[in-house]
Structure formats: C-alpha cells, structure tokens
Design a protein with these regions (language model features):
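Auxiliary Fe-S-binding modules of radical SAM enzymes
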Residues: 1-6, 40, 44, 48-50, ...
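Active-site beta-loop-alpha junctions enriched in small/polar residues
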Residues: 27, 59-61, 90-95, 117-119, ...
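Conserved alpha-helical substructure of the radical SAM core
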Residues: 28-55
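Active-site-adjacent beta->alpha loops and helix N-cap segments on the catalytic face
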Residues: 63-75, 97, 122, 126-136
Length: 215
C-alpha cells in the first residue's frame, strides 16, 4: 500500500537504540558513531526511488548531547535538496531537550510526528525511559514555534488501556494542538516482548476515531 503511493520510511542514527521499550524489536545496547554521509545516502535513495512522501524516523540516541538533532536537520535538508517529496519526521523525545526539538523544526518538515504510544498508566511498562508529559510538551512546542506545521501522533491499542484512559489521551493531544492521530493494533514482536492483552475489532477503532474527531 505504501509503495503504491511512492511512500517509504527511513530509520537513521544506526540500528541500535539506547532505550529498552517493551514493545519494540529494535536492538538495544551500545551504539556506534553516527555515519556523517547518512543524510546524503538517504536523499540519494529517496531520489532514485522517485518517492513522493518520505518518512524519516530514528532510534533514540540518549548517548548524544543533542539526541541526534543535528543529524536529523541535515537529513531533512538533504532529502529536500534532492527530491520534491513531502517529508514527515517521526522523532524521539530528545530527553526533553527543547533546543534539539527546535533544531528539527528548523529543517521545516511537512509533518512533525511524535508518538504517544500508550496511556500514562502503562508508560512504566511500555516506555520505561519515556515520560507522558514530555511527549505532550514536545508536540506543544512544535505548535508554539511553528503554528503552521501539522503535528501528528500515534497510539498502539491492545496493551491493556481502557476507553476512558484513551479518551483522556485524546483530549490531552487536542489540548496541545495535535492535528493528526494514527491508531494501530499492537502486535507482539517476539515472546520476549509485551504480550497482546486484547485484539480490538474494527468497529472499536471506528468508535475511538469518532471520539477523536469530535474533540
């Protein structure tokens, strides 16, 4: 489906993450130095593939003073220079480093995405080194510094959240000016990861979507 619309996602910053999130299959551990030619290589790939929509995401790099923000900036600029594609960034939280977030904003992506992932009660289990309020603060900062830039967030469902908790998250996202929301069913990557508590039927996704649209 994505490829038919010339959409692709690139993960930058290496393939090892500094955070052990319970839902994610990306390897955790000791990271390597950033590859300084990576921005240009991503741009070349996007150009050769003729992409119309490029999503850039990354591992979390808590080992870097700016969390990799300058690398993000250079990657967005390189893709912009080589292609006419729209660019969406899906960033980590940069440990609440506002200057790092500002640097990514300065690259002027078409969409700024930062996932909420789950409800506050489950953060300690799902996103152990993340913080719910930090996520909201990041999305709000983007709106404050670039009001015209669409913001986006995503939630995984089926981890044990309640409808009431989801509604509170939807209200919080609306309060900080989040423009777009994606909802997805959590799927367990391996037996070592968090189990699926429930598979939601399509009509429940529709119900939650309608709740979000009414806010």
């Amino acid at each position: 489906e994505c490829w038919s619309t010339k959409t692709a996602t690139f993960m930058i910053g290496g393939n090892v993450c500094t955070r052990p999130c319970g839902f994610c299959s990306v390897p955790k551990g000791k990271t390597e130095e950033l590859e300084l030619d990576e921005p240009e290589r991503v741009a070349e790939a996007a150009a050769r593939l003729g992409l119309r929509y490029v999503v850039i995401t990354s591992v979390t790099r808590d080992d870097l003073p700016d969390g990799g923000a300058e690398h993000w900036y250079q990657t967005v600029l390189a893709v912009r220079q080589r292609t006419g594609a729209q660019i969406e960034v899906l960033t980590p939280d940069f440990r609440g480093n506002r200057a790092a977030v500002t640097r990514v904003i300065e690259s002027r992506p078409d969409v700024f995405n930062h996932n909420t992932e789950t409800v506050p009660r489950l953060y300690h289990r799902v996103r152990r080194n993340a913080d719910y309020q930090r996520t909201l603060d990041l999305l709000q900062q983007v709106k404050q510094e670039a009001p015209e830039m669409p913001t986006k967030s995503g939630l995984m469902l089926g981890l044990g959240e309640t409808l009431e908790e989801l509604y509170e998250v939807l209200a919080d996202l609306r309060r900080v000016g989040c423009d777009m929301l994606t909802l997805g069913q959590y799927l367990q990557p391996s037996p070592e990861h968090l189990p699926v508590e429930r598979f939601l039927p399509p009509e429940e996704f529709d119900e939650i979507g309608e709740l979000a649209k009414k806010l």
